[in-house]
From Swiss-Prot:
Name used for this protein in its record: Imidazoleglycerol-phosphate dehydratase
Major subcellular site: cytoplasm
Superkingdom of origin organism: Bacteria
GO cellular component: cytoplasm
A Pfam family annotated for this UniProt entry: IGPD
Enzyme class: lyase
Protein keywords: Amino-acid biosynthesis, Cytoplasm, Histidine biosynthesis, Lyase
BP-aspect Gene Ontology terms: L-histidine biosynthetic process
Pathway: Amino-acid biosynthesis; L-histidine biosynthesis; L-histidine from 5-phospho-alpha-D-ribose 1-diphosphate: step 6/9
Length: 195
């Protein structure tokens, strides 16, 4: 994996026996450009970009073994690393939270840019796929992102039956929580450092 810093962004390239990914994460555009080849995953990524205010350009996203699990997980790894490289967690608010309704679904997201990776959600999906994306991809993406961004993320589903609505409500709340966590702050961590 290679990382290249830009003025307002980071390029991450990841090439394994399973996938080839090249992405740019920036603080400017606030939208998704390009495609992962998985339509519903693109929809979730674009939702995250819109609500977080971050820009994501997908230059390359190819599966060498045809297994979507690998592609989605490795995309999360690449995006998480780009996020960690782009931001100094000691110079931002660090904590963020948001709860977002979407029709019958209501999901909250709670974020800490702590340097300590942890992911938890209190819901499971009731179907195997949402559109063209295996539902396990949601958790695989989030775990890849969280572990390499080195952040803590909790999702709490208050209500919801439709898996499309639940996942989109979750991603909207994640984007908003990240945007709030990235707000500037003079308040320092009590420990004095974030590893």
């Amino acid at each position: 994996m290679t990382v290249e810093r830009l003025e307002n962004g980071v390029i991450v390239q990841r090439n394994t026996n399973e996938i080839e990914i090249s992405i740019t994460l920036d603080t400017v555009h606030g939208k998704l450009e390009g495609s992962t080849g998985v339509n519903f995953f693109d929809h979730l990524l674009n939702t995250f970009c819109h609500y977080s205010g971050l820009g994501l350009r997908v230059s390359t996203c190819e599966s060498k073994d045809g297994i979507l699990h690998h592609l989605i997980e490795d995309f999360g790894i690449s995006l998480g690393l780009a996020f960690r490289e782009l931001f100094d967690y000691t110079k931002v608010r660090r904590f963020g939270e948001a709860t977002v309704p979407m029709n019958e679904a209501l999901v909250g997201c709670y974020v800490d840019l702590s340097g300590r990776p942890f992911f938890q959600k209190n819901f499971e999906f009731s179907v195997e796929k949402i559109e063209d994306m295996p539902v396990e991809g949601f958790e695989e993406f989030m775990c890849g992102f969280v572990n390499h961004a080195r952040i803590t993320v909790h999702f709490f589903k208050f209500f919801g039956k439709n898996d499309h609505h639940i996942s989109e409500s979750a991603m909207k709340s994640f984007g908003l929580a990240i945007a709030r966590a990235l707000e500037g702050s003079e308040k320092k961590t009590t420990k004095g450092v974030i590893d």
